[in-house]
């Protein structure tokens, strides 16, 4: 069979022949125009990356056996290590969140055997035993792999039942050990095995697990935490494990792994990484590095600036604190909330701003340009930051307009640097110009420069804090919650704010979740499939319900790429499966919990709110304009990932169900022991019992006014509460005091009104007509029943010889009887009573 461009030919179709690589184009080697092998070298490999063509297969193997990715008969797993798939996946930029179509097909070709075996737990265990030793890529991040390992060979796992951490899944099977490349400089014991599969690091205690429907989990044995990496195969092939924060913690990561944050100067790196305690670090930052801007690197999104804070009051220069009615009181309330949540002393590191402010000063909106010597420190040019264009930062002659960032990935230009693998960008000239940029100056929060600063105030998307245990947390002003970001500062410099971009995906026991302040589980992600996983929809075509049909759907020709046009990509999937995308989004939106406005939250008047258009002008909902149906936590993560500065929550704190923390303790750095901190957090989590936390919210819904706080940080409860959310809900009012008792006058007629207060003693029962003994009493009624019953209605008129004048006179008399005024009109004489009927003995009828 002839070869094309020196590469192997296209594999056979799905289901034909042994080791088929999927549909047309799946698993095939990319052409030379798509993958420039000569321009890219895989870091850490000793052998040449150029593969040897093997006729008849898309994956280069020695003695082919089984599906792509299976180990050869010799036991040396060199098929993927020296194959084109590893070379292709090594070129994914760290800023990109999703894989392209070619990279997606390469991931599917390697994981095809595991996908087809994902029918039952028994089948998955047999697959892990049969393919033990196989090395499979994790997609993102580069340099991490899954080594297929039977459970009996996993040290320390034992009889752990992962279904206790994920009750929704019918079965979860541990199938592989997570390993990664090692930097020989960080670990001299590796030696010559740095570029060999045997030199991979497996000391992190991370294991890969698969559940029903190809749900992918990462199990952290040390912390007993189950992390949801992907909800289905399509999400796993598209995003990989790049959202798992735990992967970036190891300090022995190789040079081929995603690069970490490039600090401005080596002295600042030493200050952050070698600080023995938070107190000394805080003094050093305030003395020398206050106002310095750091280009923070977060996997899966573009660079964003983080301004190091010298004092907590500096946050008043950023939104949403600057526009608050009283910024100082709001900052006091937020500081009080952080004391209650962290239960120890803490240090404010910096404020994370949107990416458009990178290269501009981060301060009040003065609109003036500050010279380089005004404030701040001189920084070094960071390689690989072309998406943010550091070449025109503050202090240079060229200014940069704020660049909006759309879909993840975009047209990022990445260049090789000391801390990253080599990647070929779309424009080599622009990459070379970015790499050769002169050193820049980052100006602190005392001045403003650049067109992004004119007339606007930067918004703090996150406030990074460091507690006494060395863990890094992020306070989110969008929803007022505190989220864990990293276990230590070195981990934070590699993972960035990734912990806030994947909320609700970590499940741990109650004690572990309380110790690490893990957010609540996102039930929408753990218990429901993805809304855009259309091949799992109940109304999808019948052929898409089998594994082979789903495989053909995911890897069909010309499916498209969701990076550039996600709407067209989803519309194509919906048409293929016979679904209406607008209907699917509308149904999923209706299943989300409705918004809630607290009873003590003051609403804006209707004339200050944006009125919806009349029904005649409302357009039909379209999938291109509808917002994605995301849960509350997923919506916050989406806003933080794409720097949505106009995002507002839909709900406020539930006043009746929220838990109010009354702890007023003030913790000082260095005065608490680690065991005491853990005990305080566990005690508060036990008292809260999973309820929502009553907290200050700097950003409130659109129809509400901002919260107000006292100088001590306590919220001011308004005297005039808002109306209930639902019209049919009965409002609660204070009970009015009862009237004083009045002199009783026995009426001739039964009472017409209900008595709400304490009244005179009840009247003796009247003798009923027709009674013989005169001792029959009326039925007794409870006091509650008397208050709830309505007054009896007047009897219907009898149209005999009565006239309209008589009826009017009777109605007027009844109205006067119901009047409660002191002056009563004399009543007319009562009509004569009818004669009493003679009582007769009952007749006995004999049948």
UniProtKB/Swiss-Prot annotation:
Cellular component GO terms, alphabetical: host cell cytoplasm; host cell nucleus; viral tegument
Compartments, as annotated in UniProt: Virion; Host cytoplasm; Host nucleus
Gene Ontology MF terms in the entry: protein serine/threonine kinase inhibitor activity
Any GO BP annotation: symbiont-mediated suppression of host type I interferon-mediated signaling pathway
Keywords: Host cytoplasm, Host nucleus, Host-virus interaction, Inhibition of host innate immune response by virus, Inhibition of host interferon signaling pathway by virus, Inhibition of host PKR by virus, Interferon antiviral system evasion, Transcription, Viral immunoevasion, Virion
Family: Belongs to the herpesviridae US22 family.
Main function: Acts as a transactivator along with IE2, and is required for oriLyt-dependent DNA replication in the transient transfection replication assay using native promoters.
Official protein name in the record: Protein IRS1
Organism: Human cytomegalovirus (strain Merlin)
Gene that encodes the chain: IRS1
């Amino acid at each position: 069979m002839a070869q094309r461009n020196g590469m192997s030919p296209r594999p056979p179709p799905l289901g034909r022949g042994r080791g088929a690589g999927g549909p047309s184009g799946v698993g095939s080697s990319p052409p030379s125009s798509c993958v420039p092998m000569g321009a890219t070298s895989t870091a850490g490999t000793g052998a040449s990356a150029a593969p040897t063509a093997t006729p008849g297969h898309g994956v280069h193997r020695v003695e082919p056996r089984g599906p792509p990715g299976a180990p050869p008969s010799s036991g040396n797993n060199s098929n993927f290590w020296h194959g084109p798939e590893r070379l292709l996946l090594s070129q994914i930029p760290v800023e990109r969140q999703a894989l392209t179509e070619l990279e997606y097909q390469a991931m599917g070709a390697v994981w095809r055997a595991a996908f087809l075996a994902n029918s039952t737990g028994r089948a998955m265990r047999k697959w892990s035993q049969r393919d033990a030793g196989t090395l499979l890529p994790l997609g993102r991040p580069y340099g991490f792999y899954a080594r297929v390992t039977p459970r009996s060979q996993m040290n320390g796992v034992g009889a752990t039942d992962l279904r206790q951490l994920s009750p929704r899944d019918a079965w979860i099977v541990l199938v592989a050990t997570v390993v990664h490349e090692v930097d020989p400089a960080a670990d001299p014991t590796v030696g010559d095995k740095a570029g060999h599969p045997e030199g991979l690091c497996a000391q992190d205690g991370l294991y890969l697990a698969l559940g029903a429907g190809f749900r992918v989990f990462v199990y952290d044995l040390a912390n007993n935490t189950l992390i949801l990496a992907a909800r289905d195969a399509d999400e796993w092939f598209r995003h990989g494990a790049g959202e798992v924060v735990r992967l970036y913690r190891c300090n022995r990561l190789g040079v081929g792994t995603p690069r970490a944050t490039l600090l401005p100067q080596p002295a600042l790196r030493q200050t952050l990484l070698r600080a023995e305690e938070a107190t000394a670090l805080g003094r050093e930052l305030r003395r020398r590095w206050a106002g310095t801007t750091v280009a923070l690197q977060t996997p899966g999104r573009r660079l964003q600036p983080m301004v190091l804070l010298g004092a907590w009051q500096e946050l008043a220069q950023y939104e949403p604190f600057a526009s608050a009615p009283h910024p100082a009181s709001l900052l006091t309330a937020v500081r009080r909330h952080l004391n209650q949540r962290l239960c120890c002393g803490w240090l404010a590191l910096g404020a994370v701003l949107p990416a458009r402010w990178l290269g501009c000063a981060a301060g009040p909106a003065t609109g003036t340009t500050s010279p380089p010597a005004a404030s701040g420190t001189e920084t070094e040019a960071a390689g690989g930051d072309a998406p943010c264009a550091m070449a025109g930062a503050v202090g240079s002659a060229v200014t940069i307009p704020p660049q909006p960032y759309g879909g993840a990935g975009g047209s990022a230009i990445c260049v090789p640097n000391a801390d990253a693998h080599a990647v070929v960008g779309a424009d080599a000239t622009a990459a070379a110009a970015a790499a050769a940029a002169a050193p820049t100056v980052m100006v602190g929060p005392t001045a403003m420069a650049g067109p992004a600063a004119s007339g606007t105030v930067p918004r703090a998307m996150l406030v990074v804090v460091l507690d006494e245990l060395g863990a890094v947390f992020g306070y989110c002003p969008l929803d007022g919650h505190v989220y864990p970001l990293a276990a230590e500062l070195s981990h934070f410099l590699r993972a960035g704010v990734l912990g806030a971009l994947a909320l609700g995906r970590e499940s741990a026991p109650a004690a572990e979740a309380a110790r690490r302040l893990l957010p609540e589980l996102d039930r929408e992600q753990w218990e429901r499939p993805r809304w855009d996983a259309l091949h799992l929809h109940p109304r999808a075509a019948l052929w898409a319900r089998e594994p082979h049909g789903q495989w053909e759907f995911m890897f069909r020709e010309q499916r498209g790429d969701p990076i550039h046009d996600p709407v067209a990509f989803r519309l194509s999937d919906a048409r293929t499966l016979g679904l209406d995308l607008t209907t699917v989004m509308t149904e999923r939106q209706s299943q989300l919990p409705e918004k809630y406005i607290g009873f003590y939250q003051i609403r804006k008047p209707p004339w200050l709110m944006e009125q919806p258009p009349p029904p005649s002008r409302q357009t039909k909902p379209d999938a291109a304009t509808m917002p994605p149906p995301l849960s509350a936590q997923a919506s916050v993560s989406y806003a933080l990932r794409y720097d949505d500065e106009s995002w507002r929550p839909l709900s406020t704190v539930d006043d009746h169900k929220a838990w109010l923390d009354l702890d007023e303790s003030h913790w000082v750095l260095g005065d608490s022991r680690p065991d005491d901190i853990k005990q305080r957090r566990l005690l508060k989590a036990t008292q809260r019992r999973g309820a929502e936390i009553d907290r200050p919210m700097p950003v409130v819904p659109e129809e509400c006014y901002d919260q107000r706080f006292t100088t001590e940080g306590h919220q001011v409860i308004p005297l005039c509460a808002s109306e209930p959310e639902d019209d049919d809900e009965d409002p609660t009012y204070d009970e009015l005091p009862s009237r004083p008792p009045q002199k009783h006058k026995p009426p001739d007629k039964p009472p017409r009104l209900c008595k709400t207060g304490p009244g005179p003693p009840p009247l003796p029962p009247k003798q009923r007509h027709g009674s013989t003994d005169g001792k029959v009493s009326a039925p007794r009624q409870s006091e509650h029943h008397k208050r709830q019953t309505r007054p009896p209605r007047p009897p219907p008129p009898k149209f005999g010889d009565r006239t309209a004048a008589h009826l009017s006179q009777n109605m007027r008399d009844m109205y006067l009887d119901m009047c409660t005024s002191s002056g009563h009109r004399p009543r007319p004489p009562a009509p004569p009573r009818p004669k009493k009927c003679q009582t007769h003995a009952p007749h006995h009828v004999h049948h």
